[in-house]
């Protein structure tokens, strides 16, 4: 979906929800790909404006993956395909990442983050990139 490889999508699903389709976070993010209502409503206006979808529909795996993959695609597109920077944006929001990119101590080129200064962001990005790397090693040659 949205030209995303299945290993990358699986890394996000594993990190976000542990493959639990009815996962709900402490900030009420929902589903396999853990999306907040604000993000869901924004994305719904872009890809499903004519569909009768509610926030609770993110508990449906197909809906969660569809919306989560679209959002991940937008993050990767915005941050030039850099998985770590896109993961930081998926987790913490574009505004946070855009602000960090303007700081030389966090980005040499203003386009990719060199480090992740917030502990939750750093932990999240490390989980995504480690899981994605492990999947790539496991499935290399398949």
Residue ranges: model-predicted function:
Residues 1-142:
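Catalytic glycan-binding domains that act on GlcNAc-containing polysaccharides
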């Amino acid at each position: 979906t949205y030209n995303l490889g299945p290993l990358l999508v699986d890394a996000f699903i594993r990190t976000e929800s542990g493959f639990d389709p009815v996962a709900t976070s402490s900030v009420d993010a929902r589903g396999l790909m853990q999306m907040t209502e604000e993000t869901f409503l924004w994305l719904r206006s872009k890809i499903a404006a004519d569909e009768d979808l509610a926030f609770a529909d993110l508990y449906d795996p197909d809906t969660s993956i569809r919306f989560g993959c679209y959002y991940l695609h937008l993050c990767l597109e915005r941050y030039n395909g850099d998985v770590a920077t896109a993961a930081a944006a998926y987790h913490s929001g574009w505004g946070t990442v855009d602000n960090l990119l303007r700081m030389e101590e966090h980005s040499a080129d203003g386009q990719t983050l060199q480090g992740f200064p917030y502990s939750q962001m750093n932990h999240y990005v490390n989980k995504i990139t480690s899981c994605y790397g492990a999947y790539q090693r496991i499935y290399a040659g398949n």
